[in-house]
From Swiss-Prot:
It is a peripheral membrane protein. This is ATP synthase subunit alpha. Belongs to the ATPase alpha/beta chains family. Gene3D superfamilies: 2.40.30.20, ATP synthase alpha/beta chain, C-terminal domain (1.20.150.20), P-loop containing nucleotide triphosphate hydrolases (3.40.50.300). InterPro entries: ATP_synth_asu-like_sf, ATP_synth_asu_C, ATP_synth_asu_C_sf, ATP_synth_F1_a_nt-bd_dom, ATP_synth_F1_asu, ATPase_a/bsu_AS, ATPase_F1/V1/A1_a/bsu_N, ATPase_F1/V1/A1_a/bsu_N_sf. GO terms for molecular function: ADP binding; ATP binding; proton-transporting ATP synthase activity, rotational mechanism. NCBIfam families: atpA, PRK13343.1. The record marks 373 as: Required for activity. It comes from Blochmanniella pennsylvanica (strain BPEN). It is found in: Cell inner membrane. The keyword Ribosomal protein does not apply. The gene is atpA. The lineage of its organism: Bacteria, Pseudomonadati, Pseudomonadota, Gammaproteobacteria, Enterobacterales.
Amino acid sequence: MQLNSNEISKLIKRRIAQFDITCEIRNEGTITAVGDGVIHIHGLTNVMQGEMIALPSDQFAVALNLERDSVGAVVMGSYLNLSEGMVAKCTGNILRVPVGTALLGRVVNALGVPVDNKGVIQCSCYFPVEAVAPSVIDRKSIDEPIQTGYKSVDSMIPIGRGQRELIIGDRQTGKSALAIDAIINQRYSGVKCIYVAVGQKATTVANVVKKLEEHRALSNTIVVIASASESAVLQYLAPYSGCAMGEYFRDLGEDALIVYDDLSKQAIAYRQISLLLRRPPGREAYPGDIFYLHSRLLERASRVSSDYVERCTHGKITGRTGSLTAIPIVETQAGDVSSFIPTNVISITDGQIFLESHLFNSGIRPAVNPGISVSRVGGSAQTNIMKVLSGGIRTALAQYRELAAFSQFASELDDVTRKQLQHGQKVTELLKQKQYAPMAVSCQSIILFAAVHGYLEDVEVSKISDFESALILYMTYTEKELIKIIDHDGVYNIDIENKFKSILETFKSNQSW
């Protein structure tokens, strides 16, 4: 058989023309060191801060240290199956978590993966865990209250929608209880809630979830958990993940409330990560950017303008403002609020509620110290009726504390001083409240009215609690229409004042308590 060179040439040219070489450019590196959840990768280029890095066995790491010739990253999950020499690849993606209404009523980890055995969460929307806070132009002034249901907080330390209000105190002083009751009080208000548990025992969080379910508040709440048994990176990321979930509702023109319980443990987790990444330690061995850790998180809580909401929804929602209210919790040691993390967070937030051990142990619960607790938003975040009636409460308590200090050294007291001391004791007793029993504005209002207008003068201190319970019960059954008006409008006028006087006079004439 004779071969034709022309045919062979044509065949080769046709095969060359049909030959398809696909080029795949990958940014790969080699793991050079593994230990304590931290890996160092050599050879990666153009890596972003916070970028997801793909590892063998479908694992991921987050790039935190960008050095000249290597990348330091923290592994999300177990690092025990990783070893030197393995390949790591850039993904080009920043860490994102699922957001949306499908998460309400669920318990998820720091990555948005459900851990409550209720099935997979179907989410079509994902938000980055790190986001830029709304600018000054995009924000709106805070003028709407978020009711906690506590008389002492709503009257003296009001919290507004879009505010950052710190709860600070020693362990076992009722910090979490106050925040959880604030969530329970939102069950009928339409405010979406996110509870972020960082570094807590899983059994403690399970009890919180159970209580939220019992009080019909879980269906309106997302619980994000990074328990004490989980890695430091998940404890560090959990508050940012919860914040992203809250921003979804804020950007839709809705109101959301997020509780960070607590940021002290997040700071400890971040310190652990930073030391493992060989970052230079500073005060109390915390890294130099520990302030930025909390400031960039808490600055994302805000009340945004209707223009911002319209821009975020591409014109689908107009004329509505959104808000994300943050209640961070910080634990102190022996009441020392001048240590590093407490002073940082105090300087970032718009006020703080101090809870004190000696008040808690003496039976005053919530153990709020009204002298050093403050809300920088103040009366602009209160309803009209609470603003009018609460002024006398703070004054009465301030006078009581001052006189109580001097009365210890005085052998005899005049009648005026004795009356002021008795009034202060009654107001202190009146502000006590049981856990899981948040109170509506209407009920708080008539109790404060009774205290301010002298209706407690003939009531003994030991009978204050019974007087309060009986008064609320009486008002609930006899004045349903008035309760609706006050809870809806929050106005205070001469008609409501006369109505309150009539209710109290009729109630006291019955002596039903």
